[in-house]
């Protein structure tokens, strides 16, 4: 302890000597440089690795990057659009909206049509049969068109009008097999499969009619937003190429249709609950560049949903037609039908329900969500596409580094960077020239410098004052 006190007392005297100061500086620099060299050598990292190896089994892609996912809940997106589901092979339901307690039942039965003798003629107008229930007008039109019925060429639809306010109305499509209606029956069967999914058929007991009635929704089956998308696309008049046109622009909104420039926050009303993630303008910009992603299809659907929600609140057929034109631009290359083909061929496909992405927990950056594929009715295991999300992690890191580089380039003037670079080149070149030492003038061997005269190789002055001396000359660098 006494030696330590004596050392502190002698510090002023110690630093009075310049040599001691130099030694202290050199010692400090050597210690710091030694620590840096030891750290860069990797021996400390190797020791930490050997101590912690096998103690952490967390599911992480890399440093500060996590593999995360979320599930789309279409009920939060389409508040006013119908939802479809199948109860059994012959009974399906179309709920008017996700908040409605009314539904339209579609039965594929083997009962012979009995209503056509006394029913009114229906030509795309259902008012006479659904008196007191105008909310079923457009859903009936979409369902009949979705099944593939043509009012001009196909057999007429029969209906039994409502007798009272709370009574049922009934519509029947005649599928009795005959040479004239065989094609019509096949077309309706294809429409049922397309809207409600595959079902088991028994060729020995052929169905004779499709019956549609109004009923109440009591949770008879679970909704499928894939069927809802098929229902919307089936009623679209045409499909256009999926790419932003010259006048195309993104419009961000909340569930009520109000502009929300902050981005798509996927919480509560939209995709996921619990403030999981907000995909803002960055994701929108990526979708404008790479618009072949299933997630971009969903974002485009949300974008069109803004005006659709405002118009559907009026519960008019014009509003529904406006939504039809919006859906036309949703999925151009018909991904739903393509996925249906993949489902039949047992190839993994996207059902627009679950998406995965890479999240950088430290910076908050994330990759554009990609669809979690389905095979044989279940989601793929994470190990089945491990290479894909590891590669996506690398792309995210590369994108972040590129943004940081561009940001730094923007903060540092390029002229200053160029000036610093060329000044360093000039200093290095001048140092090299200084070490080489180029000769500058001639001397007569054994004589002093002849300044201000300059000698030629014969020892004579170039100005003519001195004649040839015949003495040896040599080059010198310094005077």
UniProtKB/Swiss-Prot annotation:
Swiss-Prot/TrEMBL site (Cleavage) positions: 58-59, 245-246
Keywords from the UniProt entry: Disulfide bond, Fusion of virus membrane with host endosomal membrane, Fusion of virus membrane with host membrane, Glycoprotein, Host cell membrane, Host endoplasmic reticulum, Host Golgi apparatus, Host membrane, Host-virus interaction, Lipoprotein, Membrane, Metal-binding, Myristate, Transmembrane, Transmembrane helix, Viral attachment to host cell, Viral envelope protein, Viral penetration into host cytoplasm, Virion, Virus endocytosis by host, Virus entry into host cell, Zinc
One Gene Ontology biological process: receptor-mediated endocytosis of virus by host cell
InterPro entries reported in the protein's UniProt record: Arena_glycoprot (IPR001535), Arena_glycoprot_zinc-bd (IPR043015)
Binding-site positions, Zn(2+) 1: 57, 453, 461, 463
Residue ranges crossing the lipid bilayer per the database entry: 18-32, 34-53, 419-439
Residues on Cytoplasmic side: 33, 440-479
Lipidation (N-myristoyl glycine): 2
Sugar-bearing residue positions: 88, 125, 174, 202, 214, 314, 351, 359, 376, 381
Binding sites annotated in the UniProt record for Zn(2+) 2: 441, 443, 449, 479
GO CC annotation, single: host cell plasma membrane
Keyword tRNA processing tagged: no
Pfam families with a match to the protein in the record: Arena_glycoprot
Site (Important for GP-C-mediated membrane fusion): 33
Source organism, top-level taxon: Viruses
One GO MF term: metal ion binding
Disulfide bonds: 85-221, 265-278, 287-296, 350-371
Extracellular side: 2-17, 54-58, 59-418
Family stated for the protein in its record: Belongs to the arenaviridae GPC protein family.
Function: Stable signal peptide (SSP): cleaved and functions as a signal peptide. In addition, it is also retained as the third component of the GP complex. The SSP is required for efficient glycoprotein expression, post-translational maturation cleavage of GP1 and GP2, glycoprotein transport to the cell surface plasma membrane, formation of infectious virus particles, and acid pH-dependent glycoprotein-mediated cell fusion.
Annotated domain remarks: The cytoplasmic domain of GP2 plays a role in ER location. It also contains a zinc-binding domain that allows SSP retention in the GPC complex by accepting a cysteine from SSP as the fourth ligand.
Protein known as: Pre-glycoprotein polyprotein GP complex
Organism: Guanarito mammarenavirus (isolate Human/Venezuela/NH-95551/1990)
Phylogenetic lineage: Viruses, Riboviria, Orthornavirae, Negarnaviricota, Polyploviricotina
């Amino acid at each position: 302890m006494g030696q330590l006190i004596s050392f502190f007392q002698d510090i002023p005297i110690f630093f009075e000597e310049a040599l001691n100061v130099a030694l202290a500086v050199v010692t400090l620099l050597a210690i710091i440089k030694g620590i840096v060299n030891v750290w860069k050598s990797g021996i400390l990292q190797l020791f930490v690795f050997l101590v912690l190896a096998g103690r952490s089994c967390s599911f992480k892609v890399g440093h500060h990057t996590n593999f995360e996912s979320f599930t789309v809940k279409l009920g939060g997106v389409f508040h006013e659009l119908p939802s479809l589901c199948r109860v059994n092979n012959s009974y399906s339901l179309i709920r008017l909206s996700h908040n409605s307690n009314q539904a339209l039942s579609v039965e594929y039965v083997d009962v012979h049509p009995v209503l056509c003798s006394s029913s009114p003629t229906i030509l795309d107008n259902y008012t006479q049969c659904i008196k007191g229930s105008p909310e079923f007008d457009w859903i009936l039109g979409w369902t009949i068109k979705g099944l593939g019925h043509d009012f001009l060429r196909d057999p007429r639809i029969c209906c039994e009008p409502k007798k009272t306010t709370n009574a049922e109305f009934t519509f029947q499509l005649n599928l009795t097999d005959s040479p004239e209606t065989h094609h019509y029956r096949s077309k309706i069967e294809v429409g049922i499969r397309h809207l409600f999914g595959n079902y088991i058929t028994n060729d020995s007991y052929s169905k004779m009619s499709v019956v549609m009635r109004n009923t109440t929704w009591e949770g008879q089956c679970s909704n499928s937003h894939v069927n809802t998308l098929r229902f919307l696309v089936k009623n679209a008049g045409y499909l256009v190429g999926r790419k932003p046109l010259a006048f195309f622009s993104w419009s961000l909104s909340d569930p009520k249709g109000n502009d929300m420039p902050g981005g798509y926050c996927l919480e509560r009303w939209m995709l996921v609950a619990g403030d999981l993630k907000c995909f803002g303008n960055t994701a929108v910009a990526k979708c404008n560049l790479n618009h072949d992603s299933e997630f971009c299809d969903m974002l485009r659907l949300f974008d069109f949903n803004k005006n659709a929600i405002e118009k559907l609140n009026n519960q008019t057929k014009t509003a529904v037609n406006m939504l039809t034109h919006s859906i036309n631009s949703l999925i151009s290359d018909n991904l739903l039908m393509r996925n249906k083909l993949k489902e039949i061929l047992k190839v993994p496909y996207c059902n627009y329900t679950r998406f995965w992405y890479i999240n950088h927990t430290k910076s908050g950056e994330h990759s554009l969500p990609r669809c979690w594929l389905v095979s044989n009715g279940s989601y793929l295991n994470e190990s089945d596409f491990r290479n894909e999300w590891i590669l996506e992690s690398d792309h995210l890191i590369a994108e972040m580094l590129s943004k940081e580089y561009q940001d730094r380039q923007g903060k540092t003037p390029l002229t200053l960077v160029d000036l610093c670079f060329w000044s360093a080149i000039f200093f290095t070149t001048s140092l090299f020239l200084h070490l080489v030492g180029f000769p500058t003038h001639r001397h007569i061997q054994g004589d002093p410098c002849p300044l201000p005269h300059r000698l030629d190789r014969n020892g004579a002055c170039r100005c003519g004052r001195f004649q040839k001396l015949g003495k040896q000359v040599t080059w010198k660098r310094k005077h």
